[in-house]
Every structure is written in C-alpha cells, then in structure tokens.
UniProtKB/Swiss-Prot annotation:
This is Anhydro-N-acetylmuramic acid kinase. The gene is anmK. It comes from Legionella pneumophila (strain Corby). One of its GO terms (biological process) is peptidoglycan turnover. ATP binds at G10, T11, S12, M13, D14, G15, I16, D17. It comes from the Bacteria. Its EC number is 2.7.1.170. The keyword ATP-binding applies. Disulfide bonds: none annotated.
Length: 366
C-alpha cells in the first residue's frame, strides 16, 4: 500500500481539491476543498480576463498559489491524522492560467510553485504535467481519460464519462478498444462567470437560475457556430477562450440575464449531447463527474437530449465526482515517481508514450 496526494484547481477556479489516494487500490481515503484567499482569486480573475498584471506580480502569484496548495495538504493531513513522512509524493496540477495549442508554438502554463509546495510540506512533489505532452505533439489536455480508463478497466460495455468543470471533456471507453477523449467546450465556466457578474454568486446551484429562464434559440444557434465545436479531435481549449468577452459580443440589449443563463446551460448540454451522439450508437451509459455533476437542471437537459442513454453521476459507482481529478493527479504522480510512462496518443494526439511531470524531491530522514 502506498499513499499519494493529488492537488487540483480546475478552470472553474472554485478552490483547491486535495485528495489522499491509496494505491494500487485507487481508494480515496479523504478529500477536502480549500478556497482560494480573496487576493489570490482576484489576481487569478484579472490574469485570466487579460487585465494588466506585471511580470513581478505573476511571479509572486506563482509562489502564493504554491503556498495555498501546501496549506491544502497541511489541512488534509491534519484532518486524516497522517504524517507527511507516510506520503510517497504529491501530484500537483497547479492552476492553469493559459492554454492554447492552436498556433505554431503551443503553450500551457500552470501556476503553483513546486519547490514551494515541497519545501512547505516536506513531501516530494510532481508538477508541470502538461508541458511534456505538448512537446510530444499532444494537446496537453485532457488527461482525465487516462484515469477514467483505470476506473473502468473491467468494463463490459461501452460507456462515456464527461467531466464538467470549467471546460467539459469526454472519455469514451469500450472493451478491447483504445480509450479516447478530448475537450468538448464550455462546461461551467460561462454559467459561473455570468451568474457572478449578475448576482455575485460563484455558481448556479443545481441550475436553479437557468431553469427560471427561457433558452434564446437564435443566440444558442449562433454560439454553436463557433469554429472550436467543429474541429476534429483530439482538441483542447482553455477557459480564457470561452470567456465573458466571447459571450458579450453576441448579446443583444433585450436579452434578459436569466434567459442568457438558460442559453448557456443549453450550450453546455447541446455540445455534450452532440459529442456523445456523433461518437457511437453503442453508448448506453453516460457518467458525469466534476462540479457539473451536481447541476440537476443540466442533468435533466442531458437526459432529454440523449434518449436511450442513462445519465448518472459517477457517485453512483461509489466514486466522488468532486475529487476525481485530484485523485488522477495523485495517480499520475505515482506513475512518474515509479518511472511508468503513460500513453496519451489516442487522447491528446501525442506521438508515443511519455513520463509526465517535473519532480521536486525532498530528502526524507527517518
């Protein structure tokens, strides 16, 4: 038995998920979510929205996020009463602030200094997972299908798994076939940004506000014409693409805020449903994870758009939808520490297998 910690803050930027994972059983021992401090969240919002930040302030933010990730580890270990020396390594995703693979020089950047995390926790850290995949010709995302493949390793039927974070991504798993996956488009990011702008709430709980509006079909049809939705897979995208500025250039003065929220939920539902329907007629089970798995109105829309396919939360398998990505980075850290390459060729389009991540070691004294 080996213990690893995974740290994840996704494109929703709703906090740091920390998960203690037992391997090789893939059992979640404990998980917590630590909210970002107001200053860090404000600086992250400014950075994502393209507001001016100096190079010095970005460097400081990298260290501050590292400190907050380390504090999440400290809180996790205190709650579960585990000593840092019992942990083999931490897998830290960091906080994505930019990700673009569309040009001749693709790039990705996750903040959260690995040296800071390892020094403050006394635990070896593996971070910067996505860069190696980009260098190997991949999209750098999504990685979730790798771990979904582990969970459904004994699958006897074709299933789809959709992780609905800020960006939604899909995994297709079938017996005796290579696992495939890619980014679909906006998951929660536009809905979260719109309700925050209009109501000051971080997210639309259960999709209640969206359910009070009416879908603006001309707007929905216009949004669905975005070129990203028509790219072939593998493909990936960042939250900075599907931003409020992307949305607002399509809005008209007579649109009500609630109707716009309903339309944004419909956009997420339609792009997910279209992806599932276009892929395979054999898919009969769709499992949801990520924050969107709690959005009742979104699940109802998906069920309506996907007749004959059972839509359920991955929680029905006894797996936490909230900590699945953090668990994945704990698992990825174990692969790196043990020099086990992973195969992302059918997911990100990478050329060949690779060992992901950079290691920030701590010399343990016993």
């Amino acid at each position: 038995m080996s213990l690893y910690i995974g740290l994840m803050s996704g494109t929703s930027m709703d906090g740091i998920d920390a998960a203690l994972l037992e391997l090789p059983s893939n059992q979640l021992i404990h998980g917590i979510t630590k909210q970002y401090s107001d200053d860090v969240r404000r600086n992250l919002d400014d950075l994502i929205m393209g507001n001016h930040l100096t190079l010095a302030s970005i460097c400081q933010l990298n260290t501050l996020i590292g400190r907050e990730f380390a504090e999440a580890v400290r809180q996790l270990l205190i709650e579960i009463k585990v000593h840092p020396k019992e942990i083999q390594a931490i897998g830290s995703h960091g906080q994505t602030v930019c990700h673009d693979t569309s040009g001749n020089i693709p790039y990705t950047l996750q903040l959260g200094c690995g040296h800071t995390i390892s020094s403050l926790t006394g635990i070896t850290v593996v971070a910067d997972f996505r860069t190696r995949d980009l260098v190997n010709g991949g999209q750098g995302a999504p990685f979730a299908p790798l771990y979904h493949q582990q969970i459904f390793s004994k699958v006897n039927e074709s299933v789809a798994v959709v992780n609905i974070g800020g960006i939604a991504n899909v995994t297709f798993i079938a017996k005796n076939q290579m696992t495939r996956g890619w980014d679909i488009g906006p998951g929660n990011c536009l809905m979260d940004a719109w309700i925050y702008k209009n109501k000051g709430a971080p997210f639309d709980k259960s999709g209640v506000w969206a359910s009070q509006g009416e879908v603006i079909h001309p707007l929905l049809e216009y949004l669905l014409q975005d070129p990203f939705f028509h790219l072939d897979s593998p493909k990936s995208i960042g939250k900075e693409y599907f931003s409020l500025s992307w949305l607002q250039k399509h809005l008209k003065p007579d649109y009500t805020p609630a109707d716009i929220q309903a339309t944004l939920l419909a956009l997420t539902a339609h792009t997910i449903a279209e992806t599932i329907l276009n892929e395979s007629e054999e898919i009969k089970q769709l499992y949801l994870c990520g924050g969107g798995a709690h959005n009742t109105h979104l699940k109802e829309n998906l069920a309506r758009l996907l007749p004959g396919i059972t839509v359920k939360s991955i929680a029905e398998l006894g797996i936490s939808p909230d900590y699945l990505e953090a668990m994945m980075f704990a698992w990825l850290a174990a692969q790196t520490i043990n020099q086990i390459p992973v195969n992302l060729t059918s997911i990100t389009g990478a050329k060949g297998i690779a060992i992901l991540g950079a290691v920030y070691p701590i010399i343990k004294s016993y």
